Amino acid sequence: AEGLVPTGLSVDGIDYRKSAGNPLPTITDPRTLYLNARQGMASSDFSGVTILLPKEAGLTELAEQINGAWQKDCSLFFSVEEVPQEEFDKRLAADSYTIALAPIRAEGGSVYQMLQQFTAEGGGLTGWSAPIYSQRLAESAQQTGSARCALLADCERQLLEGCAVVPLLGQNRRLLLADGITGLVFDPFTPVLDLTDA
């Protein structure tokens, strides 16, 4: 992912990703940062850590890849817990998780609504809150054009720098089907449409 907000979204006719630039924090050596942070911690401090996923969201393979990388680079392995979407939403809302892989949506293509999910008014997706974040987001609703893009970009950077979220991948391809169509298999990452059983 190039940022939390995927490519292809615009704000007042301006390409948001192009205007906002790269919001990802610069971490020159993530492994050294991790090793420094882990000093004084025992491996047992990480026991019981699980990666929470919504069932049937297509995130199982991604969780396995992440777990493999953590095991290889950091000698850590976490169990994966897949739960129905309703339970997943409840646990996110109750802050009852250690690590969660949560799809973040830009409903209607709105950067503002996407970022609002991280405020109390927008549902508090991660339980993270920062008054300056909410203030800047509210200010962005009063602005237009490049001024609005700049405020939204500040919000996106704040989320990423505060490690409230870490974007793993972005998807802006989808397939819409008419009612009654069954048996199609769509892989948005390739993209491939399999009509074998249709």
Provide a role label for each language-model segment.
Residues 1-68, 72:
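Append "and occasionally in soluble cytosolic enzymes with long acidic Gly/Pro-rich linkers
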Residues 2, 36-55, 103, 143-179:
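Bilobed periplasmic-binding protein-like "clamshell/Venus-flytrap" ligand-binding domains
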Residues 10-29, 91-95, 116-139, 170-198:
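Short, solvent-exposed loop/beta-turn-alpha elements that line the ligand-binding surface or hinge
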Residues 19-26, 54-62, 80, 84, ...:
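Extracytoplasmic/periplasmic, Sec-exported soluble proteins
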Residues 29-36, 58-65, 69, 87, ...:
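Extracytoplasmic/secreted proteins, especially bacterial periplasmic and envelope-associated proteins
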Residues 51, 70, 92, 98, ...:
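Hydrophobic, well-ordered secondary-structure elements that form the walls
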Residues 71-122:
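Periplasmic binding protein-like
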